[in-house]
Amino acid sequence: MAPLRKTYVLKLYVAGNTPNSVRALKTLNNILEKEFKGVYALKVIDVLKNPQLAEEDKILATPTLAKVLPPPVRRIIGDLSNREKVLIGLDLLYEEIGDQAEDDLGLE
């Protein structure tokens, strides 16, 4: 039986439809579709339309990307254009490498 894959729950906080917001979403979608296709959920939150959500989650700047699940919560604030920095910042790159090493060794 194949092992269950983790589902990654992410929130992207943006401020309207600005060039920075559009670029952050496009870049993030590219990374997620390439690296985590089918095992992630992304919620985009416009802090101009939903300021209460930003306040509840203590978001002070945009764009902010938060990995909610699996724990621990991790955040990246600002530029999301560097794939490796995004994956490392969210603590996803090391999991990816660890999972690949386990696959190579036949571990579960």
Swiss-Prot record:
It comes from the Bacteria. SMART domains: KaiB. The keyword Aminoacyl-tRNA synthetase does not apply. Changing residue 67 to A: Circadian rhythm strongly weakened and destabilized. GO terms for biological process: circadian rhythm. Pfam families: KaiB. CDD domains: KaiB_like (cd02978). Stable from pH 4.0 to 10. InterPro entries: Circ_KaiB, KaiB-like, KaiB_domain, Thioredoxin-like_sf. The keyword Oxidoreductase does not apply. Key component of the KaiABC oscillator complex, which constitutes the main circadian regulator in cyanobacteria. Its composition changes during the circadian cycle to control KaiC phosphorylation. KaiA stimulates KaiC autophosphorylation, while KaiB sequesters KaiA, leading to KaiC autodephosphorylation. KaiA binding to KaiC yields KaiA(2-4):KaiC(6) complexes which stimulate KaiC autophosphorylation. Phospho-Ser-431 KaiC accumulation triggers binding of KaiB to form the KaiB(6):KaiC(6) complex, leading to changes in the output regulators CikA and SasA. A metamorphic protein which reversibly switches between an inactive tetrameric fold and a rare, thioredoxin-like monomeric fold (KaiB(fs)). KaiB(fs) binds phospho-KaiC, KaiA and CikA. KaiA and CikA compete for binding to KaiB(fs), and KaiB(fs) and SasA compete for binding to KaiC, thus the clock oscillator and output signal pathway are tightly coupled. Has 2 forms, fold switches to a thioredoxin-like fold (KaiB(fs)) when bound to KaiC, KaiA or CikA. The KaiB(fs) form binds faster to KaiC than its alternate form, so less fully phosphorylated KaiC forms; the KaiB(fs) form activates signaling through CikA and inhibits signaling through SasA. The C-terminal region may confer species specificity; C-terminal hybrids do not all rescue deletions in S.elongatus PCC 7942. Belongs to the KaiB family. Undergoes a major conformational rearrangment; in the free state forms homotetramers with 2 dimers. When bound to the CI domain of KaiC, KaiA or CikA switches to a monomeric thioredoxin-fold (KaiB(fs)). The KaiABC complex composition changes during the circadian cycle to control KaiC phosphorylation. Complexes KaiC(6), KaiA(2-4):KaiC(6), KaiB(6):KaiC(6) and KaiC(6):KaiB(6):KaiA(12) are among the most important forms, many form cooperatively. Binds to KaiA; 1 KaiB(fs) binds to the KaiA homodimer. Binds to the B-loop in the CI domain of KaiC; SasA and KaiB compete to bind to the CI domain. This is Circadian clock oscillator protein KaiB. It comes from Thermosynechococcus vestitus (strain NIES-2133 / IAM M-273 / BP-1).
